[in-house]
């Protein structure tokens, strides 16, 4: 079973790194280098228009593209789990994971990325911004979905190759999960949905749902879950499995009010 997360727009390259964390190298550096070459040819104004960014943010990312190197080091990069700093990763709380937790996560967690395709938790990454939905034209087509094509699905197949019942647990957003070519994927997909009670009905509230995805990833990591059925025991953040609203491919978790 493999857990799938989205990356985060917010990055943290300032907080001191915890000691003793191992690291690995992303699998698609050649493809990342090709994308960086295209981005380097764009002016900050063009980047602002392409990604709908403010002028200061576009200028920052133009500088990042120029500084990016195919070789990651301790001075120019950090592990993906430490670099990403959004709501999902607030829920995951990677800094509090043990060494055995990290080793398990490295084998059972994948993070989708517009620039890197797909990452393992300990892959070193450099500061960047490139969302999967960006309409960056390449030789493969007009957007990143066409650029990555079958590559991400084939990578996930490889990681699930030895699993007798390959299952991909989707904790990613739809924008990112669209990058997984379902026709090329040799695995069953199970989606986790997190709903909060508001206005008289249960509904997905983005901020809470993102954090809950990170909580679910943490739960699976710390409990070494290997089958989708085990996910039903998730109870972090006040959520509980809702069997009447679920089916085998869509596990729904609900809560009445946010945990204090």
UniProtKB/Swiss-Prot annotation:
Record's GO cellular component terms: cytosol
InterPro entries: YaaA
One biological process term in Gene Ontology: response to hydroperoxide
A Pfam match: H2O2_YaaD
Source species, domain of life: Bacteria
Family indicated by similarity: Belongs to the UPF0246 family.
Name assigned to this protein: UPF0246 protein Veis_4789
Organism: Verminephrobacter eiseniae (strain EF01-2)
